[in-house]
Amino acid sequence: MATLTQKFHGLLQHPLEPLFLPKNDGTLFYDLPERFLTSRYSPIGQNLANRFGPNSPASSQVSNDTGVPPTVVTIKDLDELPDLTFATWIKRRDSFSLFNPEHRKAAGKLTKLFLDQPNADRLVDVAAYARDRLNAPLFQYALSVALLHRPDTKSVSVPSLLHLFPDQFIDPAAQVRMMEEGSIVLDENRMPIPIPMNYTATDAEPEQRMAFFREDIGVNLHHWHWHLVYPASGPPDVVRKDRRGELFYYMHQQLLARYQIDRYAQGLGRIEPLANLREPVREAYYPKLLRTSNNRTFCPRYPGMTISDVARSADRLEVRIADIESWLPRVLEAIDAGFAVSDDGVRVPLDETRGIDVLGNILERSAISINRNLYGDVHNMGHVLLAFIHDPRGTYLESSGVMGGVATAMRDPIFYRWHKFIDNIFLRNKARLAPYTMAELSNSNVTLEALETQLDRAGGAVNSFVTFWQRSQVDLRAGIDFSAAGSAFVSFTHLQCAPFVYRLRINSTARSNRQDTVRIFLLPRQNEQGRPLSFEDRRLLAIELDSFRVNLRPGMNNIVRQSSNSSVTIPFERTFGNVEQANAGNAQSRFCGCGWPAHMLLPKGNANGVEFDLFAMVSRFEDDNANVNYDENAGCDDSYAFCGLRDRVYPSRRAMGFPFDRRASNGVRSVADFVAPYKNMRLATVTLRFMNTIIDRPTN
């Protein structure tokens, strides 16, 4: 009997193959009512059942090969078939974009349809009917959101998009070679197909120095999964999450800071905000990605192209540059006035408590934006204008560039310029807020006596970080449609950092045991020319490495914290774990939380070594406490910094990015000035060195 996880994973696997074809490497069969077949296949339904159904020779072969009967999912007929016309206008093999308002609306309605089903079994039946009639990425997105938000499916892991649509992440040449390998070579003899490290440009393009970041599979999966956990449209109980708008700000602010830090290390300058949409876009990008659903490429952008108004009737999409130019002054006026106006005329303060959260939902135009008509859709429509810069009117029947998808947008250098522009709007609001007071920053109960790091190995170097290349493998069989059964491994090379530990010595003067919060940030020192950065620049580029609760006894406490326990990251297995492991119930492979990929915890640095300031503070738990129960060592609670906690409030009442999210008081000219008055803070100088060597990741 199929488990709930197997039923739903079968619906998600091989998204372009009809559901009547066997799934799970030929071991899972769906027994469908005949009227569930699409118009193409219903006239030959009996023939298909004889060839591919639960009683077919294919099913018998499974028993002969494994000695175990195949798993059969019997789909029950529905008394009333759901009306899917709200979504069927998006063609099954066309592109799908959460930045397109009409696509987003269809996704919200489909999510609601799935959420409204009375139980998980009925959801399986309804999803089985809808699957082959709808756009494949749309179906995957809506069903995944529903699985994450239904009480009766929360034990079902959502497979990584890499395993469902690998074409959005890997060199298309690798897919051709995978199909060749699968057609000719027996499973036990197949070799991983290597994906080149640099296949989108040569070193003649300076921006290619950052391809390791922009085109990292884990980084792009993080962006996709964040938008899965925090959908902008759908039923209110799905969209309305604690501090959703602030998380939109903070997650993007942190990835921009990480990107900028590595730009400096690679000899590249500041990210220039894309503030003028009428100027030519100097950056080019040739993504080298192919949508296998229709064999159309993600279109490139040539150097110096000019953004135009978008009017594409087939996509039900109409966006004018003037729209953004009219919305933006209203947003800035609200910031400068200190309040925004809701659609019912109420003034909503943009204060230190909720201001950034309100502003985040306004800029993303989520379903809980307080006034979508007045403040518009600045963020999403910027993505749309850039995604269709090559064919704004659909004259040449070209689909969008990578800026049109949440799983691909971060590959493009222009993503960072656009988001730097958006980030500056948030910073305008943050600049209005008063600096933190001494009472807010201090902790009279503790003294942070010492801070250092050490590489986690015998005799490991102190205050020294090491990064290097790592070659890993991932099995993409669940996303390769109409291909031979068996494994489909690719190998890819990505950044990795050597494991390390933090060592803190904390003296507690309290008379009893107490709990506090340790916050750890990394701050750059120099720009690309080796010149010192101002404190303001360093504050804005402080990247969060960890935050954790600590139990302190009276007197001296020696705290050791593993880098792998970071509250920012998720482990490799949760980013890349395969569908087969999840079907088997492997808890380590459950894709239950979003988070920054662990292999990107540290910046890359360079071979000469880059110096940073490591900052730690011990803040008062009573000021942080959000009265929420969570276990930092549990699989879904361990990476909350960018993603919060599932179904619970954010675990800290402090502003995200505290204490660097606000300007400092007058007189602070350096990080040392900032730390000096506070015995609960400490700095350490650390050096990050990149080793240009490739180490294979151990495989099981």
UniProtKB/Swiss-Prot annotation:
What positions does the entry give for Cu cation 2 binding?
H379, H383, H419
- InterPro entries this protein is in? Di-copper_centre_dom_sf, Hemocyanin/hexamerin, Hemocyanin/hexamerin_mid_dom, Hemocyanin_C, Hemocyanin_C_sf, Hemocyanin_N, Hemocyanin_N_sf, Ig_E-set
Where along this sequence does the record place binding of Cu cation 1? Answer: H223, H227, H252
Query: Which residues are processed away as propeptide to yield the mature protein?
Result: 1-51
The reply to whether Secreted figures as a keyword in the UniProt entry is yes
Which sites carry carbohydrate?
N64, N198, N295, N445, N507, N565
Q: A Pfam family for this UniProt protein? A: Hemocyanin_C
- Which protein family is named in the record? Belongs to the tyrosinase family.
Job description of the protein: This is a copper-containing oxidase that functions in the formation of pigments such as melanins and other polyphenolic compounds. Catalyzes the oxidation of o-diphenols such as dopamine. Also oxidizes monophenols such as tyramine.
Q: What is this protein's name?
A: Phenoloxidase 8
